[in-house]
Amino acid sequence: MLKKIIILFLGIFLLSSCTDNFRNYFQRSANNKLFDVKGAKGGKRKPVYNNKYIALAKKNIVEDNIDYDNDVDDNYDNDGPLISEKIDNVKRNREMYLNMIKSDIARQKAEFSATQSNNVMTLSKANKKVRKDDSYKEKKIEEELNQIKAMLKETKRDITKYTCPNATVNQNYVPPVTNYEHVNYPPIKNSNPYNNTSKVKQKFIREDDDDTNNACSI
């Protein structure tokens, strides 16, 4: 058992010696994660910068407000063989931010074109809108008609409550004319006096009395 522990310890030590720095091997990533498998591209990870710093750098690039470092690094000898391998950090950063600005402009153009295409009124969209408006209007008109029908039914029901139950509706009834002009006819000569005791006259009087008794009182 002790031999296995010693072999395991030596194996871990040998594997850790392959790294550049054993302490930095288990450090968190730029995204503050211990095991981060997202964002890696080509075996390299883009560092996470401060958004305010990036916005300020883009603004300086657009406004051409760049401070060039004219100081010569002491680690490089002007006459030495490594002068050609010196990296221009200002130029590299400028190119990086220019690429970021170009990508932002392309993304903004794509978003603007997408919104414009959605806002453009085509024939099909216009037809759909007209159909929707027409269907809404038809629905409102139908609701109003149903309300009017219900009101008419209720009014008719109220009217039937106040009608005489014994009264019959005569379809051929014509209301009497009351706005006629009075005409004075000449008296009829040689007319016989009315017989008040005639049976026919008494019959009509009885019928009139029956009609008045069956009439509805107001």
From Swiss-Prot:
Lipid-linked residues (S-diacylglycerol cysteine):
C18
Instruction: Give Gene Ontology CC terms.
Output: plasma membrane
Q: What is its main location?
A: membrane
Topology class, membrane: Lipid-anchor
Enumerate the transmembrane spans: none
List where in the cell it is found.
Cell membrane
Q: Which UniProt keywords apply?
A: Cell membrane, Coiled coil, Lipoprotein, Membrane, Palmitate, Signal
Q: Which PROSITE patterns match?
A: PROKAR_LIPOPROTEIN
Q: Which residues form a coiled coil?
A: 136-164
Q: So which residues are the signal peptide here? A: 1-17
Keyword match Signal: yes
Q: Where is the lipid attached (N-palmitoyl cysteine)?
A: C18
This chain belongs to the protein called Uncharacterized lipoprotein RT0399
Native species? Rickettsia typhi (strain ATCC VR-144 / Wilmington)
